[in-house]
Structure formats: structure tokens, C-alpha cells
Amino acid sequence: MAKTSKRYREIVQKIDRSQLYSLVDALALVKETAVAKFDESVDIAINLGIDVRKSDQVVRGSVVLPSGTGKSVRVAVFAQGDKAKEALDAGADIVGFEDLAERVKAGEINFDLAIASPDAMRVVGQLGQILGPRGLMPNPKVGTVTVDVINAIRNAKAGQVQFRADKAGIVHCTVGRASFDVEALRANIMALVDALNKSKPTTSKGVYLRKMAISSTMGVGVRVDHTAIV
């Protein structure tokens, strides 16, 4: 515990918590202070100027990060017939229909993302209480309910991430790994910011992107001067 506390103090001393850093400087600091023995994820938190109590101000979507996520993604596809064959050919790890639904009901959930063809939703709809709490329920708003299963699979494998504002109006997202260089992380963040701007509710008033902070898994949050990048 003493070693952990000492390490934490050393990290904190390198970061001025009252300062707003440029995106590049913030990323450099996050990389410098990510000293765990594993490749820490780099995470971002963005406060949005939305009223989460209003149904027309829900911010949700997906974006393919140009530098990827640094994580291998296992994709399950609910489809049958030609769509099932397309999914297999596109590199899906698991493909099935009612048989896959039964495996999920039995607790066999060995995938990171679920995609469904529209006709499969009559089967997938029964799995809401199982997949929903795990963030795995296919949804057309993030492109995981689609007739184009090939493109959905390719996007998932290429580093697509989903985002959604929480009850406090904050979007949390992993944008890479500490082993990524600064430019790769910057490109991923810019892609996310662009996607968030495109998802801005028309009824949102005032400043939309309000605050931004970046951290590694075991690190300390670094505040970013987001006004220079939005």
C-alpha cells in the first residue's frame, strides 16, 4: 500500500490539476504517468451541455477510431441464411440465430459486441434483460442492427467504439492504449469529438462541449483545453 501511495504522489506532482493543457501536452503527460506493468488504456471524459432529463437530448452513437483501440474484439452476429454466410465471410467470431440466443440464455456470452440483422430482432428482443445490462444489446442507433452486417463487422474489427452520455451528461470512452504514440491518440480523440459534434441534439442550448479530461487506467485525470480543438 505504501508503494502505491508513493507512486500516486509522484504522478500527482507531475500534473497541475488547476491547469488546462493542450491536447498534445495532456496526452504526453498521460503516457508519461502510465507506469503500470500492463498496457494501460487511455480514457477520456467529456462533459456535454445537454439536459439528460429530456428524451430529445440523448447523445448516443458510434465512431471508428482511425488508430484502433488496441483491443481485439470478438463479434457475435445474429443472422440466418445469406446474412449468416456474409457474417462468417466477413470475419465474425460467432454466428447464429435461435441457437445463439439459446446459448446466451444459458449464460454463454463469450463476445464483446453483438450485431443483428433486422429480421433477427424477434429473437434478440428476448435477450434484452441479459444483453442490455452488459451493454451488448444490438441497437440501430449505433449501427449494430443493420442489413449491412459485412460493414458492421469490419467497423467493429477496425476499432469502432460506442458512446453514450450518462445521467450526468458525461461521455466516457476508451481512445487507445498508453503504448500508442501521441499522434495516434490525438487522431482517435479528434474522431470522437467530430462524432459527438455530429450527434449534438438540435434542442441543446449554449456551450455543447464543456469540459474534457484524459487519464490512463491507473493514472490521474489531466484537464484539457478543449476550446482549441472543437
UniProtKB/Swiss-Prot annotation:
Q: Which Pfam families match?
A: Ribosomal_L1
In terms of CDD domains, this protein maps to:
Ribosomal_L1
Q: Which PROSITE patterns match?
A: RIBOSOMAL_L1
List the Gene Ontology MF annotations in alphabetical order.
Answer: rRNA binding; structural constituent of ribosome; tRNA binding
Q: Which Gene3D superfamilies did the record assign? A: 3.30.190.20, 3.40.50.790
Q: Which residues cross the membrane?
A: none
One biological process term in Gene Ontology: translation
Keywords for this entry? Answer: Repressor, Ribonucleoprotein, Ribosomal protein, RNA-binding, rRNA-binding, Translation regulation, tRNA-binding
User: What start and end residues bound the annotated signal peptide?
Assistant: none
GO cellular component annotations, sorted alphabetically?
A: cytosolic large ribosomal subunit
Keyword RNA-binding applies: yes
Q: What does this protein do?
A: Binds directly to 23S rRNA. The L1 stalk is quite mobile in the ribosome, and is involved in E site tRNA release.
Homology family: Belongs to the universal ribosomal protein uL1 family.
Subunit text: Part of the 50S ribosomal subunit.
Cite the NCBIfam families for this sequence.
rplA_bact
Which protein is depicted? Answer: Large ribosomal subunit protein uL1
- Which organism is this entry from? Nitrosomonas europaea (strain ATCC 19718 / CIP 103999 / KCTC 2705 / NBRC 14298)
